[in-house]
Amino acid sequence: MKKQLQKLLTCLLSGILLLSLLVTTPANQLAVKAAPAVNSPYKKACWISFLDIEELLQDKTEKTFRATVSAMYDNVLHYGMNTVIVHVRAMGDAMYPSDYFPWSEYLTSDRSNPGYDPLQIMIELAHAKNLQFEAWLNPYRLSRDNKSTVSFKTTPYYAQFLPYTIEYTAPGGQTCLALDPARTETKDLIVKGIREIVSRYDVDGIHFDDYFYVSGMADQLDIVSRKNNVNALVSQVYSTIKSIKPGCTFGISPAGNPDNARSQGADIDTWLSTPGYIDYIMPQIYWTDVYMTANGAVPMFSNRCSAWTALNKQQLPMYAGLALYRVGTNSKTDLGWAASDTNLAYQYVTAKQLGYDGYALFRYQWLEKEIAAAELNHLKNY
C-alpha cells in the first residue's frame, strides 16, 4: 500500500510539473522581446549539416546552387537567425577545392570538382545577407558507415592517410574510419586544413562538434589519454587561427551531458577554465524540461544548462545547442516535445536567464518542415 501511494504521488507530481510547463509560455518569463536578429548581441544560429547539403545542394549547377543557398539563407533570416554554421568537412572531405582532402561526396556524388567554389559562394551570399558564417569541421571522422567507408577507400587519400587511420566497428556493426587522434600526422593534417580555410576564405569562425573519440573508435584508451590527444589538437587549432585572423572565433559543440563529453575526449573543464583553447562553448542540450526518470519528471534542459554554466570559469560566451529535429516527436522519456509547441522559445529564454548568449538549431531541413513551424514562430519572437 505504501509503495502504491508513493507511486501515485510521483505520478501526480510529474503531472503537475508537466502542466505547469505547458501553461508557462516564454511571454510569462520575458517581457521585452529581442532586437532584430541581425542587430542582436545574441547569436541565433542554424547548423547546415552535410545531410542538408546532400539533400538540397548535391550535384547542382552553379546557378542552381546559388539560388538554393540564397533561399536557404532567406529561410534562416525569416526565423530570426543571424548565423549559419555550415559543414565544410564532414568526413575527411571538403566542400571547397582543397590541397589536402578530396571533394565531398555529399556535394558531388562522384566526388568530382563541381566547376565552382561552393564555399566561396556560401560565404559571399551569407555576408550579403548580413549573416555570420562559421565553417564546421569534424576533425577526425573519415566515414560513418559501411557505404561511406567503401567510398573513402576509393579515393587516393585513403592510402595517404592509412598509416594514421583507425578502422573500427561502430555500434550497430558498421565499419567506420577515423584519423587517429594520438598521431602527430593527424594533428598536422587537420591544422593544415584549417589554415587553408582561414587563410583563403572570409569565415567568421571555425566550429567543431562532439565527434572526437566516438564509441568503438579506441575503447581501450583511457579518458586522460583521450583528453590529452584532443587537447593537443584544440590548442594548436586555436593558436593557428589567431595567428592568421585574430577576429576569427573557434568554438566547440560537445555532447550535452558533461560526463559523456569527457568520455569522448572533450576536456571541457580545461577549455572552460584555461585560455588558449576555445572562444566559446555550445553544448548540445537536446532535452526538454519534462524528462521522465524512474523518480518522475525532471527539468533536464534547465539542469544541463546550469551544469555547463557552473563549469565556465573563464566566463566565455555560451550558446545552447537546441534539438529542432525533435519538435513534435513522441518520446516515452522526453514528454515535452509532443506536449508543447513552445519548447524552443522556453529553452532560449531559460538559457538566457542562466547566462547563455544565444542558441543554434540542429538542423536546417527542419526549418522547412510543417511540424516545426509553430515552434519556430514562437522562437523567432525572442
Predicted regions and their residues:
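Aromatic-lined carbohydrate-binding/catalytic grooves of carbohydrate-active enzymes
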Residues: 81-114
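Aromatic- and glycine-enriched glycan-recognition loops and surfaces
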Residues: 60-79, 106-129, 229-233
